[in-house]
Amino acid sequence: MRTVVWQSLSETQQDAILERPAITEGANITAAVAEVIAKVRAEGDAALFELTEKFDRIKPESIRVTEQEIEEASARLTAKMKQALEQAYANIAKFHNAQKPTPIKVETQPGVVCEQVTRPIQKVGLYIPGGSAPLPSTVLMLGVPAQIAGCRKVVLCSPPPIADEILYVAKLCNIDEVYNVGGGQAVAAMAYGTESVTKVDKIFGPGNAYVTEAKRQVSNDFRGAAIDMPAGPSEVLVIADETADADFIAADLLSQAEHGPDSQVVLVTPSVLIADQVTDAVQKQLKQLSRASIAEKALASSLIIIADSLTQAVSISNYYGPEHLIVQTKNPRELLPLLDNAGSIFLGDWSPESAGDYASGTNHVLPTYGYTRTYSSLGLADFSKRMTVQELSAEGLKNLAPTVVTMAEAEGLDAHKRAVTIRVEKLTARS
């Protein structure tokens, strides 16, 4: 890990060390994904079978996972695993249930009533990556809010073979359809539909560069589907003072570093002693990890920043805007009102990032790459949409008419003006 003293750097140097690595889409990825999308749109299920065999080296008997297969997968899980998944489900459901919006109804002036109502997005698609380890936690983070929001149709795609844990959580979340398909072809299938896969309105979930690019492309096509948020490498920033536990900090940094070689890992502290202790602790703990080689690559570009105060540490964090922000200080809650840009915040020694990743109740689908300045943690609102309603009485329109007419005249929109005056004239004729 590289250690730098913030005050010793010029403004240009400060910007440079906090700059994230470029997300390399590359013309080859863009073109390859466009080709996959076009093929799925043209050939439907046949393309899904062909591409699954090509990329996943598996020839599934069926694209859709049957109810029987889901039941059999559930039966194979241990009681311990089921209990863990069910507790995580309960906590996530409790937190997301609390996010249900309150209807708004306001009389802005006599006879003019304005409302805001919320409706679920009707059809949503959930993408769950494959890889060496199953990600049932991601199914929970996407499936639970979709269930609570009341989405009419929830579709899940994941590369085959789909892990038993994923299928069990799909059952917990009452997901309607599960498909043995991954990669850009899964995104295309959900965005445009095939003979088997339902076309959805919005697609959620992480993935590799090809999945990310496929989501970008379908979201830019009005015939495609909306997506949850832009994606980039995973990140953690830790703010720590001299009271922090160096072993805890090291464990948190490594839990992020093991995600991948492009993971962003940053410690900001006013304590040189803590910086040194964390450096030593990271090296000791690294040797115990099964994914040490991956974590080591991430650590090669990681940072320890020596700030002159906690106030400056907060300022650095707000500028960087991390996906995960861990605060290990004497009074962490005192800093919370000062923290503006972060996907999810973990306060105090006993709040590891892992808790939020799996089971505390918050959502682990978070903005990265500095998007925390404008994007939020995934939540119930992302599976819903707002509509406004207005209802004017005759007297309400009569009282509001002069304002609307004056503004319509100023904008030169005669038909807008006439839509009001024609009504006022009829009211006048009746009286």
UniProtKB/Swiss-Prot annotation:
Q: In which pathway does it act?
A: Amino-acid biosynthesis; L-histidine biosynthesis; L-histidine from 5-phospho-alpha-D-ribose 1-diphosphate: step 9/9
* Residues holding substrate: S234, Q256, H259, H324, D357, E411, H416
Q: Which residues form the active site?
A: E323, H324
What catalytic activity is recorded? L-histidinol + 2 NAD(+) + H2O = L-histidine + 2 NADH + 3 H(+)
Cofactor binding note from Swiss-Prot or TrEMBL: Binds 1 zinc ion per subunit.
Keyword Metal-binding listed: yes
- Biological process, per Gene Ontology: L-histidine biosynthetic process
Q: Name one GO molecular function term.
A: zinc ion binding
Chain positions recorded as Zn(2+) binding sites: Q256, H259, D357, H416
Write down the required cofactor(s).
Answer: Zn(2+)
As recorded in UniProt, its EC number(s) are 1.1.1.23
Keywords, in A-Z order = Amino-acid biosynthesis, Histidine biosynthesis, Metal-binding, NAD, Oxidoreductase, Zinc
Where NAD(+) is bound, by residue? Y127, Q185, N208
GO CC entries: cytosol
NCBIfam families attached to this UniProt entry: hisD
Q: What does this protein do?
A: Catalyzes the sequential NAD-dependent oxidations of L-histidinol to L-histidinaldehyde and then to L-histidine.
Query: Which HAMAP family does the record associate with it?
Result: HisD
Family stated for the protein in its record: Belongs to the histidinol dehydrogenase family.
This protein's name: Histidinol dehydrogenase
